[in-house]
């Protein structure tokens, strides 16, 4: 027992930094920003005149997708089958030439309905609870909000509009800008 403790102390002293780097590189810790949702503008009867809807950026983390050879093909096939505007040659190019990149935006402002087939394919399980597609790796969705005006130009001079994301420029959007805006959150995991 004393010999084992002595050996562990020797390894820690001579190679501790090397092993610490290996352990830290294997950890799957991440932190994500949770975007705030700008408040709705409603009339006296509760009719929504301005609202924010969730949209998603499709993000490719090439370092995860290319970490094992068996992840590349299934991930690219899933992306091209679920998103018709994605090209497999472009995705293979990212895998080959940007394999260290952790953040490549593949598609901006996709609706929930557009990303749902991919999410279902990625999370599908069989009757025993085992993942059907365990090799789809390195794709995630970045949520943000887009301002919408259900009645278009109706009362637009009063309601106003936003620019540069969530900055009220005119009308109620500008007057109540501080009230309508929120603060981004953060999720750790």
Annotate each predicted stretch with a short phrase.
Residues 1-189:
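Periplasmic/cell-envelope proteins involved in peptidoglycan metabolism and beta-lactam response
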């Amino acid at each position: 027992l004393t010999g084992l403790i002595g050996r562990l102390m020797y390894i820690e002293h001579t190679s501790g930094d090397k092993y610490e780097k290996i352990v830290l590189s294997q950890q799957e810790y991440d932190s994500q920003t949770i975007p705030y949702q700008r408040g709705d503008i409603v009339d006296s009867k509760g009719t929504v005149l301005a609202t924010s809807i969730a949209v998603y950026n499709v993000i490719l983390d090439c370092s995860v997708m290319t970490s094992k050879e068996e992840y590349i093909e299934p991930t690219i096939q899933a992306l091209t089958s679920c998103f018709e505007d994605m090209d497999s040659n472009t995705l293979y190019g990212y895998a080959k030439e940007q394999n260290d990149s952790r953040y490549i935006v593949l598609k901006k402002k996709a609706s929930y309905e557009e990303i749902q087939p991919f999410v279902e394919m990625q999370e599908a399980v069989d009757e025993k609870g085992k993942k059907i597609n365990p090799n789809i790796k390195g794709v995630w969705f970045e949520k943000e909000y887009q301002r919408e005006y259900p009645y278009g130009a109706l009362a637009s001079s009063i309601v106003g509009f936003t620019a540069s994301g969530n900055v009220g420029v005119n009308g109620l959007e500008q007057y109540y800008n501080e009230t309508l805006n929120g603060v981004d959150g953060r999720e750790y995991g």
